[in-house]
């Protein structure tokens, strides 16, 4: 049985070791997990797009599923910012800092693009300061 910790739509990034190493990105939507196979994983540089191959939807139980050949690389929730027939723009909120991506349809397949984070991005404003450490300035001329 699957227990949900939040009302926000969930995501999971599975790492597969067989039959060949790849990742699966799964986004909760309308009671299922929409899924894309990522042969090279999530992009880490906005200048580099990664192939994302749409695969059949999975049951929500896959949010917590792992076995000898499949492990959970990351999990959390996601928020959609924009969508049309050719693209989905969203932020993943997982174990790392939030990251905004665009899934871009290229015909039969998709490209996954890491977007540059903007200071005025509401996700950054809400979550971007979690590693901020305030500091005090001191007068170095005082003895």
What feature does the model see in each segment?
Residues 1-143:
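A charge-rich, low-complexity, intrinsically flexible signal that marks solvent-exposed coils, linkers
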């Amino acid at each position: 049985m699957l227990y949900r910790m939040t009302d926000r739509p969930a995501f999971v990034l599975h790492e597969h070791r067989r039959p060949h190493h790849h990742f699966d990105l799964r986004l909760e939507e309308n009671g299922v997990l929409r899924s894309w196979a990522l042969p090279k994983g999530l992009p880490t540089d906005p200048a580099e797009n990664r192939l994302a191959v749409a695969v059949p939807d999975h049951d929500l139980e896959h949010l917590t599923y792992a076995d000898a050949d499949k492990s959970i690389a990351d999990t959390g929730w996601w928020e959609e910012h924009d969508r049309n027939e050719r693209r989905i723009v969203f932020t993943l909120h997982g174990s790392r800092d939030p990251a905004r991506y665009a899934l871009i349809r290229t015909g039969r397949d998709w490209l996954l693009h890491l977007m540059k984070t903007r200071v005025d991005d509401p996700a950054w404003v809400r979550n971007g300061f979690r590693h901020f450490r305030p500091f005090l300035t001191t007068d170095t001329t005082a003895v």
